[in-house]
Amino acid sequence: MFDKHTHTLIAQRLDQAEKQREQIRAISLDYPEITIEDAYAVQREWVRLKIAEGRTLKGHKIGLTSKAMQASSQISEPDYGALLDDMFFHDGSDIPTDRFIVPRIEVELAFVLAKPLRGPNCTLFDVYNATDYVIPALELIDARCHNIDPETQRPRKVFDTISDNAANAGVILGGRPIKPDELDLRWISALMYRNGVIEETGVAAGVLNHPANGVAWLANKLAPYDVQLEAGQIILGGSFTRPVPARKGDTFHVDYGNMGSISCRFV
């Protein structure tokens, strides 16, 4: 595993790429011995940089929750990242496209916690007991590293994505909040419209068989670092659609049926 100085240097590179709105060479090309543990250490350093600049931690995201995405990334479990206070947008927002590099939208459910959740041995039932409400959420993902390196043509790896805050860049909350036992969360479905055309559909059971399973997984994953999910935090449970590119001028409307809808426009 690399030393802390190296983790900080990599985090600073990613931070500069985000601020300059310019993709950089994949971290794993310059640091071929990087491990998953290194990647999360880089992510923690990146979060520390942001907090030092005045940001606050508002929650966490879970990604790569489908078997297909895990297989394509050559890992056997999800990944996770941090949600900061300046990442959140309201339903109906005009989202500044120029703030991002290659923004894409995913359909998710967010769990807002009323009680702390701590692993190990956290279960789906513990998640239900700790959750205040569940609300529709769109995750705005972005990439500060090239997907395909222009020089070598090598694709980025999961180490690059994890280091890059698991590709998170924004969150749009909306729709109707519900108590976790008000509906069978597995059967919550959504239709994603971009410019009036359905681009993606999905059902929440596609996230680890149940959207609350990802929250339990995260609590258990963070336990060795003596980190718990705190009351009031927002946890994005994972996407149940493929990501859809968001371009300047695009309007998104995502219909969650009984849970309402979320709309936003990229300007």
Swiss-Prot record:
Protein residues bound to Mg(2+): 106, 108, 139
Keyword terms of this UniProt record: Aromatic hydrocarbons catabolism, Lyase, Magnesium, Metal-binding
Needed co-factor(s): Mg(2+)
Cofactor: binding details: Binds 1 Mg(2+) ion per subunit.
Gene Ontology biological-process entries: catabolic process
Highest taxon listed in the record's lineage: Bacteria
Molecular function GO labels: 2-oxo-hept-3-ene-1,7-dioate hydratase activity; 2-oxopent-4-enoate hydratase activity; metal ion binding
Any one Gene Ontology cellular component term annotated for this protein: cytoplasm
Reactions the enzyme catalyzes: (4Z)-2-oxohept-4-enedioate + H2O = (4S)-4-hydroxy-2-oxoheptanedioate
EC number: 4.2.1.163
Pathway stated in the Swiss-Prot or TrEMBL entry: Aromatic compound metabolism; 4-hydroxyphenylacetate degradation; pyruvate and succinate semialdehyde from 4-hydroxyphenylacetate: step 6/7
Cited InterPro entries: Fumarylacetoacetase-like_C, Fumarylacetoacetase_C_sf, HpcG, Hydratase-Decarb/MhpD_sf
Functional summary from the UniProt entry: Transforms 2-oxo-hept-4-ene-1,7-dioate (OHED) into 4-hydroxy-2-oxoheptanedioate, a step in the 4-hydroxyphenylacetic acid (4-HPA) degradation pathway.
Self-association state and partner proteins as the record states: Homodecamer.
Family from the record: Belongs to the hydratase/decarboxylase family.
Cited PANTHER family: 2-KETO-4-PENTENOATE HYDRATASE, ACID HYDRATASE
Record's protein name: 2-oxo-hept-4-ene-1,7-dioate hydratase
Source organism: Escherichia coli
Encoding gene (name): hpcG
